[in-house]
Design a protein with these regions (language model features):
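RecB-family 4Fe-4S metal-dependent nuclease core
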Residues: 1-330
Length: 330
């Protein structure tokens, strides 16, 4: 709050700072007792979802809270999208991702190095303004907290490029894809027949260097190495607590299914608030061993187990340890 007060006191923002005490009263009620029975409609919707392609996000939602999964993916409420009057912090990532996409996209299929990334820096402000205008009302001049949010977005983007400039000093990588669609089909054995279900995803960027592939996903939230570390001794990898791990295992699996040795794939997360940390890779054990063919086989088996649970679920109820979504607090 002190930072906000200091920033807004600047005369150029034309903003008056007024301090008030505020007590928040939560008007929403948590409908934790809501239970929805599975029926022919829900089963057909889940089957269609699996045929068209289920994303790591949907898998994570099912594991974290079946009721939330029902609302978002079975009856299709999804995320509410609208043209916003102000820059909400929750959608900061959308703007940052869009700017990164626009600047890297022209180099898709090309080899780039440190000098190429340096040319991105003068373009940040223009691309950031365009992204904000597209996401928010065009006739609303940014002021106050929105200007601070824009500044945060700018610094996040600058930090990505500064990190890449240093990382690529003296070498080059090929941009294999930007906002790259990934998918893989899995055979699921049912009584007397085999059906295919599809896993799909969208990687922010994929690079390659000397036959090795680097899958990148940018995160506005906090990223910790333990969130993408797995052990052979773990009882299960696909659990409600392993959202980021499931995402990177899924990306690795889908790229592996293109015929790439998993040991030549490094799926990573980049915390935009922790740019000095750099890329945080998916790895096995404390020694940061690479993912193996055996790991992919185990992932596929666990994935099919989750899919079977989706198809056979009898009721959709709130997970007691999950946060309440907006659908449960109305």
């Amino acid at each position: 709050m002190l930072q906000v007060k200091h920033e807004l006191s600047d005369a150029k923002y034309r903003t008056t700072v007024r301090e008030e005490d505020f007590v928040h009263e939560n008007q929403g009620t948590q409908n934790s007792d809501t239970i929805i029975q599975s029926n022919e409609f829900s089963r057909s919707r889940i089957k269609a979802l699996l045929e068209n392609g289920i994303s790591p996000s949907a898998l994570n939602k099912f594991l974290a809270c079946p009721l939330d999964f029902y609302y978002r993916y079975v009856i299709g409420l999804g995320e509410m999208e609208e043209l916003e009057e102000s820059m909400e912090a929750a959608t900061l990532g959308i703007v940052v991702h869009q700017v990164l996409e626009k600047l890297f996209e022209p180099f898709e299929g090309s080899v780039i190095g440190s000098d190429d990334i340096k040319k991105f820096l003068p373009q940040i402000e223009t691309q950031l303004d365009l992204a904000i205008q597209e996401k928010y009302t065009k006739d609303n001049e940014l002021s106050g907290f929105d200007l601070i949010t824009k500044g945060v977005a700018r610094r996040m983007i600058e930090n990505v490029f500064k990190f890449e400039i240093e990382r690529l000093e003296g070498k080059q990588v090929k941009i294999e894809g930007v906002e790259e669609s990934l998918e893989a089909s899995l055979p699921m054995n049912k009584v007397g027949r085999t059906e295919l279900v599809k896993l799909k995803g969208l990687a922010d960027r994929i690079d390659s260097e000397n036959g090795h592939f680097h899958i990148i996903d940018f995160k506005t939230g906090k990223v910790e190495p333990k969130q993408v570390t797995f052990q052979e001794s773990d009882e299960k990898w696909l659990t409600d607590r392993n959202g980021k791990l499931i995402q990177l295992l899924s990306y690795t699996y889908m790229w592996h299914k293109k015929g790439v040795d998993p040991e030549k794939i490094s799926a990573t997360l980049f915390g935009l608030k922790q740019s000095k940390q750099g890329y945080v890779p998916l790895h096995r054990g404390k020694n940061e061993a690479r993912v193996t063919e055996a790991d992919m086989e185990r992932f596929e088996k666990e994935l099919l187990d989750v899919i079977v649970k989706m198809l056979e679920i009898s009721e959709f109820a709130h997970h007691p340890e999950a946060k309440y979504c907006e659908f449960c607090t109305q």
